[in-house]
Amino acid sequence: MFKLIPDATFPATVLVPNGDAPLRLKVIFKRKSKEDLSEFTLRAVKLDDLSLCEETLAGWEEVDEGYSRDALEKLLKAYAGGALAIYSRYLESHARAERKN
């Protein structure tokens, strides 16, 4: 059944750059309304990587450490392209959802 009020979160898979073999990161994203997403994208250029990702992520699955601010910081330090991959997938997920609806 189609929900007029969507769930607050949704799952997605982010391909985190790792040389020739990107790593699949299963995440739970926070859903934003159209207005909130528009405002967020305007602010995003001023946010540091950690803040940017914290605002989009509600959690992750199948990672060797549970989701937390410290664990997210470790991920972003270990994988230089991680923040951009997360942000890009987040926007893509919203755009894809809008096209489907």
Can you say where each PLM-predicted feature lies in the sequence?
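Acidic, low-complexity intrinsically disordered segments
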Residues: 43-101
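Short, charged/polar N-terminal "headpieces" of proteins
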Residues: 1-43
